[in-house]
Amino acid sequence: MSLLKITTFQTYLFWENIDKNLEYLTLRLTSIRETTDLIVLPEMFNTGFSMNPDKLAEKMNGKSIKWMHEQAKKYKCVVTGSIIIKEKNNNYNRLIWMRPDGSYEYYDKRHLFGLGEEDQHYKAGAKKLFVELKGWKICPVICYDLRFPVWLRNTNQEYDLLLIVANWPERRSLHWRSLIPARAIENQAFVVGVNRVGHDGNEVYHSGDSMCIDPNGKVIYYKPNDEDLYTFSINKDVVTEARASLPFL
């Protein structure tokens, strides 16, 4: 049996205010009362879903990266979420996978949200990221990537857990609540989606709806509307049994 303990933080965000967001997150994370293997924050957790990278983008040695390392070291776990990064004259919506020792991996959002003009301000990534944690193979992606099942296809059982960080608006929450279980069932993997709550600077409301779905489509965790810092465990045996009983992959 291989258990993975995950802490998801469905949080309010302060619009385009890096310092205030990091200060708030630091305070709220102190509510974690048990050990955890992984802390998951939403997409652009330090700014909100902003199309203002010229003002907000940081380098890979910036304050938000340093903050992630501080939290990973403090809680002795991986910390992940996406931030705005500038690199070689391009801006990226970049997910950071930060370990306690300061080593990290990253994933640049592949599918940019054209309806929100994200493609006009950011450069798309080209490669998937697969990471390992406590014997689990994990594939982290960002928000709009959820709508592209071919990109997420678990062709060679490359992952046991698909992880989605998001700023997904309430007006399309039905899609979020439908697609996450679909990705879990078709890929015979756990799927964890972590969204924000509240209004952003464009008055777009986010209802959260963070969730964990097992490979059979069973709901392990679901939280609409309110801010929530929640820790739960998932069992890799569920993945093994699902794939053995229904060898579809």
Model-predicted regions and their roles:
Residues 2-8:
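Extreme N-terminal starter segment of soluble prokaryotic enzymes
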Residues 10-15:
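Short polar catalytic/cofactor-binding loops
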Residues 18-19, 23-100, 105, 169-182, ...:
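Cys-nucleophile CN-hydrolase/nitrilase-fold catalytic domain and related Cys-dependent amidase chemistry
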Residues 37-38, 138, 161:
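Structural motif
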Residues 63-77, 147-229:
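CN hydrolase (nitrilase-like) catalytic-core segments centered on the catalytic cysteine
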Residues 81-83, 94-98, 129, 193, ...:
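Short beta-strand scaffold segments in enzyme catalytic cores
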Residues 86-157, 171-178, 241-249:
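Active-site catalytic loop in hydrolytic enzyme cores
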